[in-house]
């Protein structure tokens, strides 16, 4: 897989330590892998895999899994998790979702990207590469946050954007992957018929062993986009306003009935592509 040294996303996802946020995503990751239908012997590519929230449970179900991520620290963390779990059928490597060479054409039964490839630049290249490495008769499954959605992550990104400088000209927002028409256009350009693309809304729940303000602090300290928002907000004296806005959001959306715990469901677009 080509070196991602020039990818502007690399610094963003190597900033902080996304594993600290990913810890709140494990339970839903396992449930999603089961719902997708991962089975023994399946060759799976997990794209934008982080430290293995869906890659590790896929391997535990008996699939042969390769995790690819732009961030070296997350790849290293994933390989440590695989070793600790004794999983010989799971490995992680650095790579760019928009250029998966030298992965061979049609080499995977299933390509999974849950809140991963949506953050890569060049979305048409990303779609083309996912289709290219999937065998005929195989599937691609994406999970993408939805722009303007009232639930957690879309609102974190929306609030954060209000505190950060405007993106460079030509920037394509990651949440454009959460719009069905865009999904169909991008995979259509990669040669997929519209009837082979299915989009449905699904729910991903975050489970955090702490209060909503403590969960906000985890995002502030470890999640690249939120860290950047606070860096920018601190420069113009608005960091406290950003913190208060995020704490209000997390507190309002917390559904946990246990004191000192946080449980927040977030809506996403689940995309299933059949490759023929």
List each language-model region with its residue ranges.
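Conserved class I S-adenosyl-L-methionine
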Residues: 1-42, 53, 77, 85, ...
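C-terminal helical/coil "lid" or tail adjacent to the Rossmann-like core of SAM-dependent
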Residues: 4-14, 197-258
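A structural alpha-helix within SAM-dependent methyltransferase catalytic domains
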Residues: 33, 56-59, 79, 124-131, ...
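Class I SAM-dependent methyltransferase SAM/SAH-binding core
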Residues: 43-100, 125
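A short acidic, Gly/Pro-enriched loop at the edge of an enzyme's catalytic core
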Residues: 98-110
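A short SAM/SAH-binding and catalytic strip from SAM-dependent methyltransferases
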Residues: 109-124, 146
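Conserved catalytic/acceptor-binding region of the Class I
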Residues: 124, 131, 135, 139-210, ...
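Core SAM-dependent methyltransferase catalytic element
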Residues: 190-192, 264-276
């Amino acid at each position: 897989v080509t070196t991602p040294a020039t990818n502007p996303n690399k610094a963003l996802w190597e900033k902080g330590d996304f594993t600290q946020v990913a810890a709140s995503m494990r339970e839903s990751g396992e449930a999603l892998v089961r719902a997708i239908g991962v089975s023994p012997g399946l060759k799976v590519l997990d794209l934008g895999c982080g430290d293995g929230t869906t890659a590790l449970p896929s391997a535990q179900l008996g699939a042969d899994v390769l995790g690819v991520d732009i961030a070296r620290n997350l790849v290293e963390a994933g390989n440590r998790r695989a070793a600790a779990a004794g999983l010989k059928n799971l490995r992680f490597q650095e790579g760019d979702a928009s250029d998966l060479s030298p992965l061979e054409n049609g080499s995977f039964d299933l390509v999974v990207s849950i809140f991963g490839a949506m953050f890569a630049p060049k979305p048409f290249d990303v779609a083309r590469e996912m289709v290219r490495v999937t065998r005929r008769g195989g599937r691609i499954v994406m999970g993408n946050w939805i722009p303007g959605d009232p639930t957690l992550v879309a609102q974190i990104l929306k609030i954060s954007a209000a505190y950060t400088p405007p993106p460079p000209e030509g920037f394509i927002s990651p949440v454009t992957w959460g719009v069905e028409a865009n999904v169909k256009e991008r995979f259509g350009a990669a040669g997929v018929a519209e009837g082979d693309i299915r989009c449905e809304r699904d729910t991903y729940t975050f489970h955090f062993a702490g209060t909503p303000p403590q969960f906000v602090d985890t995002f502030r300290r470890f999640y690249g986009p939120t860290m950047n928002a606070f860096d920018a907000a601190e420069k113009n004296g608005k960091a406290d306003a950003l913190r208060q806005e995020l704490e209000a959001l997390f507190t309002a959306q917390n559904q946990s009935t246990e004191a000192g715990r946080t449980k927040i469901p977030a809506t996403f677009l689940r995309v299933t592509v059949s490759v023929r």
